[in-house]
Amino acid sequence: MVQKKLMLLGGLRYLLPIIEEAHKLGIYVITADYLPDNIAHKYSDEYCNVSIIDKDAVLKAAQKLGIDGILSHAVDPGVVSAAYVAEKMGLPFQCSYEAACILQDKSRFRQFLRDNGFNCPNAKGYSNVEDALKDVDYFNWPVIVKPVDSAGSKGVTRVDYPKDLPNAIAYALSESHNGHFIIEDFLEKKGFSVGSESFVVDGKLLYNGFYDQYFDKNAVNPYTPSAEVWPSIMEQRYQDEIKSELQRLFTLLGVTTGLFNVECRVCTNGKAYLMEVSPRAGGNRLAEILNYAADVNINEAETRKSVGLSIENMHEPNYKGHFAILVLHSEKEGTFQGVEIESDFKKKHVIEEEIRVSKGGNVGSFTGANAALGTLFLRTENRDEMDSILACINKYVKIILA
């Protein structure tokens, strides 16, 4: 039997579990980006030097290498290229190239939601500042300004007054790949912002790992999650509504099989909104912790899907307690010395520790998910215990800077 080849776009730590799952299945792994020193390349079988946002260059490399599957797992910039290559080569992917382009462009996604009767904030996309400044009366202030093509809350600003719009647009454009940005009404949430790692099989939404997002109000970017907690305490009626709307979205887009990262919220107006839906795993190791927290290995399922292997026994997660990802970060710049974790807390609640920065490395403030220093996986018996820990996390976990 000829060994299957899987191309993974990117080289970050998020790919390591997929490389491990692929190797368990006897799959040959090729990692691809333009940064040969990235950590994932040390664990793959082959490295391909190519820009993952250049879809035609990725296609050319994939055809030359004779791949059987492609993923941009938890790597947002490569999703469109992965969908493009999969469609051109007849490989498995969550959706068509056109559907991926809609989902990956915040402006196009908002328009698609609006055209198809989904709850959607008042929103408009732009490619130049002047057009946006002419539309200040179109919006119900405050507004959110963000790039149409970035993830991890990079380039996102809440703007309360029109006079501050130019600076917010400049920041959004500084984090954009394609030079486009979107402005939309700020939706005041009720309870937590919620996300989900959701898995679809043959067009049917079968798995939803809903989690609640926590934010550090002292961070430079207060819209970047500082923790995620499972299972979500969103009211069941809203979870059911979100699942129903996701299924409707996936049917309209002709989705097939694979993993999606979803962000949603219930607002003070009583409506539930789909905020982001991307055909990839979420960052911050979301799919990884679900393998601790619940009874379905979605990383294995996504790996199997990528090369056309069957997926069995996909179902809603049954949780084994209450779990959290704590995103280690600094509120100021400095030189990294280490992370101090209180010993009893570590013994009782920390199930995995991951540090991405070496001692002596430069540390920046928490401007986005890419500024994370690492993660802690936490477990408690109940939600009240988890909430009390997160409310005073600095008592247990300290970032030491010089």
Segment roles from a protein language model:
Residues 1-99, 130, 309-312, 321, ...:
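ATP-binding N-terminal substructure of ATP-dependent carboxylate-amine bond-forming enzymes
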Residues 5-7, 143, 205:
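Conserved hydrophobic helix-helix packing surfaces used for dimerization/oligomerization
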Residues 87-155:
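A conserved helix-loop-beta module that forms one wall/lid of the active-site cleft
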Residues 113, 139-159, 177-190, 196, ...:
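ATP-grasp fold ATP-binding core
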Residues 119-122, 142-145, 157-190, 220-228, ...:
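Conserved ATP-binding module of the ATP-grasp superfamily
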Residues 163, 185-255, 259, 266, ...:
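ATP-dependent carboxylate/phosphate-activation module, predominantly the ATP-grasp catalytic core
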Residues 260, 345-361:
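A structural supersecondary motif
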Residues 310-348:
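A glycine-rich beta-turn/hairpin centered on an aromatic-Pro dipeptide
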